[in-house]
Swiss-Prot record:
Region forming the signal peptide: none
Residues holding ATP: A33, P34, T35, A36, S37, G38, K39, T40
Keywords on record: ATP-binding, Magnesium, Nucleotide-binding, Transferase, tRNA processing
Binding residues for substrate: T35, A36, S37, G38, K39, T40
A UniProt-annotated Pfam family: IPPT
UniProt site positions, description: Interaction with substrate tRNA: T124, R146
Complexes and interactors: Monomer.
Span list, region Interaction with substrate tRNA: 58-61, 182-186, 266-271
Record-level GO BP terms: tRNA modification
Descriptive protein name: tRNA dimethylallyltransferase
Required cofactor(s): Mg(2+)
E.C. designation(s): 2.5.1.75
């Protein structure tokens, strides 16, 4: 067993000795894993045990009518396996990390009151980091300021907000991409509301739900073999194309006043379909509630999806841009479709790569708060750490553990 700061890692032997098969009534479990790794199947099994309630930790599942591309459980599955924080906003709305943390805090209390263990399951690692490592105390948005900034963005474009940010918060201006609508808008809102740059707020001490002295947090990171995961990703994408991801995006454009910079439209899969629809000059962009120019400008200079397909994508892009027909020819459309699928596959693999990086970061969490060390516990007992000592010490500390398969995580939780 190793102990580091406020957090503790347990060996496999320690797990079986001190934790299995039961978790404490005040437990909170985070099941963290990359996309397509089998989290949902395990979550369903755990729900059937009667011990858990499910809380989604997925920034894409919050959106209504975005089902195929997010691998969201269907209506029948959601009825049988209820998930908190699924289908809570429309695709043109935003949902901040702070809002997520506040919602989770409320839901954890509710689960415990119901005699259940909250199982936080999903792949949005930024959400997990906010829960486990904390958020800087940036003030919540003021509705009037938000409306003012949104009107400014609509009138003058995100570039105007980005230029303004450069004058009032050089650190954020340098850190953010000029097209990152959500974060630029938020940074401007914070400055107008507080007269303090968001970069200053972000340097202040963090506050994490996992520090709650009345709860026992277990953070489980499942990091499967990458070749196995890549095969699973390909299989999942094949299912999405067959189930109608392109049709789903067209339906979203028909029913919502979307823009290409919205967080929902930057989700992996949806972004690539949008680009495909632009390249094939799809008539959906003639909808009166859509700004066609915004979409075409957003994809005017698309990047090849990977080094391996760079030459192929360049040829495809050339064919698409040279057509003068109202709609792309069948051949050009087929090429654009292949490009879309290539890019979606590459983007999903890159997402998984980032998730692995985040998981490793989570497993290195530490806190400088003064707590007993392994040596001090040992010295105060005998030559070894007894089970009672460990039980006393592990109380109200975040327990970190990593697995290479979902089956190992299952054995920990069932």
């Amino acid at each position: 067993m190793t102990i580091k700061g406020k957090y503790m890692r347990l060996s496999s032997d320690s797990l079986s000795s001190y934790l299995s098969p039961n978790l404490a009534d005040n437990s909170v479990v985070c099941l963290m894993a990359p996309t397509a790794s089998g989290k949902t199947a395990l979550a369903y099994e755990l729900y059937n045990s009667g011990r858990y309630e499910l809380i989604s930790v997925d920034s894409a599942l919050v959106y209504r009518d975005m089902t195929v591309g997010t691998a969201k459980p269907n209506a029948a599955e959601l009825a049988r396996y209820p998930h908190h924080l699924v289908d809570i906003i429309d695709p043109m709305q935003s949902y901040s990390v702070a809002e997520f943390v506040n919602d989770v805090a409320r839901l954890i209390d509710s689960c415990h009151q119901n005699g259940k263990i909250p199982l936080l399951v999903g792949g949005t690692m930024m959400y997990y980091m906010a829960l486990l490592d904390g958020l800087s105390p940036v003030p919540d948005s003021d509705d009037s300021v938000r409306a003012r900034v949104e009107q400014w963005r609509q009138d003058e474009g995100i570039s105007a907000l980005y230029d303004y940010l450069g004058k009032v918060d050089a650190i954020s201006h340098e850190r953010l991409n000029a097209t990152d609508t959500q974060r630029i808008t938020r940074a401007v809102e914070v400055y107008l509301q507080t007269d303090i740059p968001i970069s200053d707020w972000q340097r202040q001490p963090k506050q994490a739900l996992a520090y709650n002295p009345n709860q026992q947090w277990h953070a489980l990171a499942v990091m499967p073999d990458r070749p196995w995961l890549h095969t699973r990703i390909e299989q999942r994408l094949d299912i999405m194309w067959r189930e109608g991801l392109v049709a789903e995006v067209i339906s979203l454009l028909e029913h919502y006043p979307l823009t290409p910079g919205l967080p929902s439209m930057r989700c992996v899969g949806y972004r690539q379909v949008l680009e495909y629809l632009v390249q094939t000059n799809h008539p959906v962009f003639e909808q009166p509630h859509l700004d066609k120019a915004q979409f075409y400008d957003a994809f005017a200079q698309s990047e090849p999806s990977s080094n391996e397909s760079k030459e192929q994508d360049t040829t495809i892009q050339s064919s698409i841009t040279q057509t003068h027909l109202p709609m792309a020819t069948a051949q050009t459309e087929a090429l654009a479709c292949q490009q879309m699928q290539n890019k979606a596959l590459y983007a999903t693999r890159q997402l998984a790569k980032r998730q692995y990086t985040w998981l490793r970061k989570v497993m290195q969490l530490s806190n400088t708060a003064a707590v007993p060390t392994t040596e001090s516990i040992t010295a105060s007992s005998t030559s070894t750490v007894g089970s009672d000592d460990v039980t006393d010490f592990q109380k109200n500390k975040l327990i970190l553990h990593s697995f290479s398969t979902m089956e190992q995580a299952r054995a920990y939780l069932v």
